[in-house]
């Protein structure tokens, strides 16, 4: 007999607990048309999937560990109370903040019939007027009024079914520049002080990263150019015509090696070629 009693007790516990692999993802119509309606009509549900608690005595981050089921969404039955005795405004203040509605009640339909109302709320830390918005949200479901003669007190103190969840914030993607755009680069050219043609200054140039055109060619250092060219071509000063005439004799084509002009030119060439 004792074995049969234990077997029956184990069977009842299995019926009251969610089965392995069970996931609770009800729709708005199912929450209103089945779960909340059975709660209001005092009809029992064999599995306690939705607990009855006063959610306003908890902060939202404490509610997941109180819930019976749920991974990212948690459900609770809660009697909505009034903020003041003679007011229809509900009291949604918690220990650390308050719930604030984001709009009016939206009707929920099933087969063209309104089965209830849905309100969205956001949780704020702090007091009203100085609160900080959080990612915690709530969907509050309630049944529609049975008659048009319900008093404000009856409309305020009603059973609600609350869905608590944390909003997932999207992460911003990093800004990626197109292939034809380059980052901003600051170039610094320090001019040499050994040449009298150069001035003592530092020039800065910024390449615009948003420009589609290639950067303009950079001006070359005149001092650098004159020394590079000097190895390949001699630098002539004075009257070019007189210098050319001194290279030729009357017979044409032969250099005059013993002329004064040739001596001057030879000293210039020897000075450039010596290491």
From Swiss-Prot:
Keywords: DNA-binding, Nucleus, Transcription, Transcription regulation. One of its GO terms (biological process) is negative regulation of leaf senescence. Expressed in roots, root caps, cotyledons, tips and margin of young leaves, senescent regions of fully expanded leaves and floral tissues, including old sepals, petals, staments, mature anthers and pollen grains. Not detected in the abscission zone of open flowers, emerging lateral roots and root meristematic zones. Its main location: nucleus. Induction: Up-regulated by H(2)O(2), paraquat, ozone, 3-aminotriazole and salt stress. Disruption phenotype: Precocious senescence and lowered abiotic stress tolerance. GO terms for molecular function: DNA binding; DNA-binding transcription factor activity. Pfam families: NAM. Residues 1-24, 191-219 are annotated as: Disordered. The keyword Nucleus applies. SUPFAM superfamilies: NAC domain. GO terms for cellular component: nucleus. Residues 115-173 bind DNA. InterPro entries: NAC-dom (IPR003441), NAC_dom_sf (IPR036093). It is found in: Nucleus. Residues 198-211 have a biased composition (Basic and acidic residues). PROSITE patterns: NAC (PS51005). Residues 18-167 form the NAC domain. PANTHER family: PROTEIN CUP-SHAPED COTYLEDON 2-RELATED, TRANSCRIPTION FACTOR JUNGBRUNNEN 1. The NAC domain includes a DNA-binding domain and a dimerization domain. Transcription factor that binds to the 5'- RRYGCCGT-3' consensus core sequence. Central longevity regulator. Negative regulator of leaf senescence. Modulates cellular H(2)O(2) levels and enhances tolerance to various abiotic stresses through the regulation of DREB2A. This is Transcription factor JUNGBRUNNEN 1. It comes from Arabidopsis thaliana. The lineage of its organism: Eukaryota, Viridiplantae, Streptophyta, Embryophyta, Tracheophyta. The gene is JUB1.
């Amino acid at each position: 007999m004792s074995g049969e009693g234990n077997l029956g007790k184990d069977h009842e516990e299995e019926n009251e607990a969610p089965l392995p692999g069970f996931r609770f993802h009800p729709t708005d119509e199912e929450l209103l048309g089945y779960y909340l309606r059975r709660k209001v009509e005092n009809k029992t549900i064999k599995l306690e999937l939705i607990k009855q608690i006063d959610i306003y005595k908890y902060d939202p981050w404490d509610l997941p560990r109180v819930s019976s089921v749920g991974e990212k969404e948690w459900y609770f039955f809660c009697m909505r109370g009034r903020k003041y005795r003679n007011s229809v405004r509900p009291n949604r203040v918690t220990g650390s903040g308050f719930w604030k509605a984001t709009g009016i009640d939206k009707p929920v339909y099933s087969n063209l019939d309104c089965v209830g109302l849905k309100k969205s709320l956001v949780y704020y830390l702090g007091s009203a007027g100085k609160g900080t918005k959080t990612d915690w949200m709530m969907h509050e479901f309630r049944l529609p009024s049975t008659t048009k003669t319900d008093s404000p007190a009856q409309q305020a103190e009603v059973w609600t079914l609350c869905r608590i969840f944390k909003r997932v914030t999207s992460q911003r993607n990093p800004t990626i520049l197109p292939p034809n755009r380059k980052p901003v680069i600051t170039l610094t050219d320090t001019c040499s002080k050994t040449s009298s043609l150069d001035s003592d200054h530092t020039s800065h140039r910024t390449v615009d990263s948003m420009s589609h055109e290639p950067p303009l060619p950079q001006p070359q250092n005149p001092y650098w150019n004159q020394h590079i060219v000097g190895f390949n071509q001699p630098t002539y000063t004075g009257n070019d015509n007189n210098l050319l005439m001194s290279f030729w004799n009357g017979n044409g084509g032969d250099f005059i090696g013993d002329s004064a002009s040739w001596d001057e030119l030879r000293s210039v060439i020897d000075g450039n070629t010596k290491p």
